[in-house]
Amino acid sequence: MRQGGGGGERMVSVLFLLLIHLALCQAKCVMTECDGEEDSNHPPCKTNKSTYLPITVTRSLNPTYMARFEKYCSYLVQEEDKAQVCCTELQLKGMTDRISNAATILGSCPSCFDNFAKLWCQFTCSPDQSKFMKVMETTGPKNVVVKMEFKVNRDFVEGLYESCRHTWFANGLALRLMSLGGKVSFENFYGFMGTKNLAQSIPINTEFQFSRMKNAMNIPTTPCHKSAGPKVPACGAIDCPTNAHQLVDISKVEHLGTKVFHPHFPDFEWLLKICGCLALTVLLVFILKYSCHRRSAPNGEDGCYVDLGKGNLEVQFEGLCARYANAVIKHPLIFVSLGLIVAAACCSGNFKFHSLTHSVDQVSAADGETRRNEKKFIHSFGPNHRIEQIFINLPPTTKSMFNMPLFEEMFQLVGNIQNLTACYGNSSVKLDDICYKPIGKNHGCAIMSPTNYFQNKWTNFENAGPPTIDDEIFDDQHWEHLKYCIRNPLTVSTYSEMSCFGEFSGPIDPILVFGGSNESIKGAEMYYTARTIMITVLIRGPEDQAIAWETAFLNMMSRYEMKHANFTFMTETSVAEEIHTAVETDKIVSVIACAAVLIWVITMLGINHWPESSILSALVHHKLLISISAVMISVISVWCSIGMFSLFGVHATDNAIVVLFFVITCLGINRIFVIIRTFQANGHCYGLPNISYREMNHRISNVMRRSIPIVLTNSLICSTCLFLAGGVLPYVSVSMPAVEVFARHAGLAILMDTAFYLLVMLPLFQYDARREMSGKCEIWPWYELSNESKINLCMEAVDGNLRSPVDWFKLAIAPLLLKKICRIWIATFFFVSLIIACYCTLCLEFGFNQVMAFSETSYLTKHFQNMNENLNIGPPLWFVVEGDVKWHDPKMQNKFCTLAGCDDNSMGNKIRSLAYAENYKGNYLHGDVNIWLDSYLQFMHPRGSCCKMDGKQFCDPSNATHCSSCSSSSVASLTTTEYEFYRNLHHFLETPPSIQCAHGGMALAKPAINLTRNGKIQSAYFSTFFKKLNLSDSIQLYDAWRFAKYLADDIERELEIPGVKVYVYSTFFPYYEQYLTLSTTVYTLVVLVLFVAFVTISLFLRVNLAGSLVTVFVLLSSYLHLMEWMYLLGITVNVVSVINMAMSLGIAVEFFGQMLHGFYNSKKPKREERAFAALVSNGSTTLSGIFPAIMITAGCLSFADSRVLITYFCNQLVGIGLVCAVHGVVYMPTLLAIFGSDFYQNVSSEEESTDEAELQDTPPSTTSSTSSTSETSV
């Protein structure tokens, strides 16, 4: 009995002890609200009772508490109607407010946010606080907690960190805002949350203890790729890289490549068309040339099929020219009057002329794709900001940008800019009147500058200081705030209790402010080493007022000096103004060039004889009138071309006009040299004392008959070259209006110059020829050579004793052609050089350095170099969605957004993933991404603090404690009606971003949405940036455009929304669309010009088919050698050089046409002698006429300020002159001597036969001079 009873007593004792132990081990609360405090953000107090147990709350008694509690801590509700908690209602309110603020940062990833909320629910409200929490330090009589110890299982903290470390917020990692120093790491993340910071709503210090002991807090975490609860989606592809997400395949993007001819050779279809055109052309020429009615054969049979009259087509053409010459001789005043009337009528259009000043109008066709997109973008969203920039470069002697004198100067500079006043009409304009204010008119201007981290106030800079003595390790106390803002630009209050936001109430990304940093340093600390400080002022006021202010800004900055740094600057109008300034300087060069050419023409056009003692006798055979008239007519031709185009609203650039005078003067001079040299070479310029009027007419008519065909043929080919390049049918567009307009103006100017040659120069020539044959002085017509002097000159001409400035050519150069060994060496060298030229052509590269538009001494040249070296990011890029999109439909929203629940291949995910991708080959995106729909969805999120309603009244987020959420949905997409969607969208667009609501859409979303009149979204854009692009590398800029276009097309295809289009726009796109078809343009231009040359020469000159083919071959060779010249001088291929390349073919015809005409009109029996005769008569004309005119023009252009003129006109003109001269004077006669015909086809027109018959009736005294001097040149 006792034993049994004793055992029962022991059992009771054990149970009693167990109950006591359980009572002692029961969890308790370790902190609670402080007595008398009503501030929910006040630190808690330590519990006064060691037995402070959790409190029980029920739904029936505490409905408000339970509603707030379940918002973030629903997992702690053990039963449906009650929960055990350690937090009072005041503590709960403070915790939910702090978690709501975190929802703004972490809310895009529900799993991350859920884990984060669990951590602080456990910390604040867990009924098991005493198991894993311990008060380490208190203060005051109320035992206000200063420091807590929080034991957390490592599995939980690692799970929380891993679920959040890839979450993005405001175009950066969210944890960047929740990590010490802005450096995202496990330790910095928990170090930040454990460090007291009232500005960040962290009321106490917390020492996190990480362990895997059983007493450490440990509850399950949700990985980012899993759902945190029913109807809650997993994190999106951007926030959770563990999800399988494939970047857009960009391997199919078309790149320009560096080589012009290798990767972009035309396709087979293009070649087939060209071959077909070639075959048809040859057939047509053969029919017209060789199937016309010739003179009857001895048997009386005709040897052809098409009756075009007596003689070959070219002979008929010469006959027409002869009849025109006779008309000019008979009625010179009528033709001159007609020419003056035409000139006056055409020049009258100059009253409507104004030059192209807007750069985009010069480089991109108005109907091009990029221009159409630009017009749509500006029409939908308004013009882009005008940008004013200042780059401040630290001198080598300055070790760091953290320099007090430097910042003092910067504050002064920014202050001067803000206070700068410009005159505008009768009023004044200040920066505050026109600057961009993203948050509204009541806020400051958007100035991206380091000084704006201090709100551009020197007093704020002086008052900024470190909070503790430990921070004195910095160079100066003022730099702590700046460095903190560089690390965390979204910080609203630093240790100095100052905001990092600028005076425009927005953040300043250090990537836009600091340049020239040491890129080997990772993270935001890289910007501490910046050697360049960038100040950017954004303007979005009326254009006229903005231009007035920019003019004042330029005047101020051009005189401004800084003692402790160097700087460069530019404004939106700088490019146009600097180009205009350079053109004004180049106009002087143009005048000098025309004067130099005129002096050369006066010197070389006449013959230097001094037959009598009077100085006036030396001026008998000079050509002052012809020389001056030729230059003046070329100038008038340019003005006529400009006037005619101006009448139809087609205007050229100032640079184009300057170059036009050079080109047309050179070509016009050549025409005069052709007729004058023909006149001189046949001995017609010398007249006997008794020369008859009919003999004079015969000589003049004969010269005109022989020179007009070659002038017209050359003009036709040259103008055709330019018209083709200028987009005249057959259309060969180079997609650059300034160059196309230049080509059209030049083509028309050549035709006008030819017309004035026929209407004005020929009558003047016949007058001057009569004067010269009569032996009269040009400037004093009353002086006349004696009969003895006239006879002596004629006799000396017959004996070959008279010398002209080009006789050295006849004596030294031309005889080499008669030597077979010389011809072999020349031909061999020609073909070897042709092979080398082909190789160099294949190495020719695309490109255009836009800095070359300015002189080397221009302030813009230095600034562009500064931008290339120091910019950290490229231009902005906009992806525009236009069409009928049902934005209120959640399924449709998922096609565009990047939040949890959105499609992995949504538009936003594609853009954002590429913008954040690193080392992805071929990717051009980098930097911040603005997805307005994401901001709107987060603005509407029920857990957020943005969209709140009080009944039907929208609540200001800064005062919305009494309001309820606009949305009852717990997912990212909005399940609302269309009416509710647009009602809330209006509130969203009018809400500025703030501490209480970071997702307000006024700053970034409002400019991105284009609404119709009834408030529906008509179009909207998502924006990002390009990576850093080389502004001097046009190939890279072109490839960036093609990449963006490919991405937009891919997005549009993936959306599969009928009627919805996606296009891209960036400010530089219109400048590089030209390269899209440039390769094909080069091929097509060459082929078409060669066809035109072949047809024209074959039909209108006395040339057989072999001669035409030789000419075309030499033309092609000259083209290839010109590209070799370009390669050797580093001249890249672009629309400017392509126009010059097309023009070179036209100029080459001026060289080759004369040689060909001279060869096939020579009566020598052998082809070597005929080539010799052509070289003597026509080669000297070329080397004394157009060739020196080109070289003189190029020499004058070398003094121009514009490097575009120097590179693409001066250097290229030198190449054109040298290549054409060598081909026309060396290669052409050599090939004709080898492959040309051995006979002269003596077919005469009716006029030629009539002239010969008339000469037979002429007395011997008058014909002797003609017959004796007809071959003096050969």
From Swiss-Prot:
Gene transcribed to yield this protein: ncr-2
Protein known as: NPC intracellular cholesterol transporter 1 homolog 2
Record keyword Transmembrane present: yes
Segments crossing the lipid bilayer: 268-288, 327-347, 588-608, 630-650, 656-676, 722-742, 745-765, 824-844, 1079-1101, 1106-1128, 1138-1160, 1172-1194, 1204-1226
Cellular component, GO annotation: plasma membrane
GO biological process, one term: cholesterol transport
Annotated SSD domain residues: 586-767
PROSITE patterns per UniProt: SSD
